[in-house]
Amino acid sequence: MINRMALREGVLIKGKAEGPPGGQGPRLTVIETVEGLSPENYSAVKRFDDLTPIDPHEHIRLEVGAEPLTMRIMDLFAPIGKGQRGLIVAPPRTGKTILLQQLAASVSKNHPELYLIMLLIDERPEEVTEMRRAVRGEVVASSMDREVESHVRLASLLGERAKRLAEMGKEVFLLLDSITRLARAHNKVVGNSGRTMSGGVDIRALEVPKKLFGSARAFEEGGSLTVMATALIETGSRMDELIFQEFKGTGNMELVLDRKLADRRMWPAMDLWQSGTRKEEKLLDPETLRRATMLRRSLAGLKPVETMESIIGAMSKHTSNASFLKQVARFES
């Protein structure tokens, strides 16, 4: 039936099932719809790899008010667009979990058209519960008490599910925490192929995580898949550092968190100089881009801590980015 109807992994099927003799699980006997379409009509849907990928050009606005300031700063200095492939680089205890919750809340409030999915891999069970209560979206998790095969299987299935939604023209926003733990799980599953990189990472271990991260794109025909994944650094593990280096530069947006800022209780603990978005001119209107660029230039030469102190101090005096940018324009004139 799968081959006859050209069903793709991750599709949502509605049909009739019967329990076979012998007490086995139910077996699908009749397929009524595939992704809400008749099987005949679904076969005409273009495959993900046959669609035309283009640069993100629709800005996902994160600002929801005066607070959280993190979302306002991201809008100006590390904007996200539909189809973005973003990496959140996070040392321990730099506010990664809160950042993800704020990101999910902003997306849910400002962009109800986005299908929000959060994938948690090898996370603490209590963190999973907290995310499910805080995030208004689909939270899928394989917690740390599950076997690594569960991590790999769930991530692969969810990645395919996201692609099926995107090829149907839907706008999908996938938050992955973390791509480091997913790569670790794959490293255990693939075993030892005899080709091991430094840090004990098998050369095949990164194939599937890279495929998942690389699936982020916007389509000329409509639809998009945005992937924002966290990468763990400064954990004391050579493996984690190698995984980060393999993913560094593969995205088109990076948000780098800084432990020194977090130690000073400065939020967001964001290194402005290492964070940014490629081709941000396609996301921000010309005036906003010009003023944000001018701000960066005015802060040039400052250390990350001094930079963020200045940004937080200036922006916290205004209840919106629009008000803040008007103030910037007055200084310019």
Residue ranges and their predicted role:
Residues T97:
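Walker A/P-loop
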Residues T94, L103-V107, P112-S333:
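P-loop NTPase catalytic core
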Residues I2-K14, Q24:
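Short nucleic-acid-contacting surface segments enriched for D/E, G, S/T with interspersed K/R
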Residues L12, P26-L28, H57, V227, ...:
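Broad gene-expression machinery/nucleic-acid interaction feature
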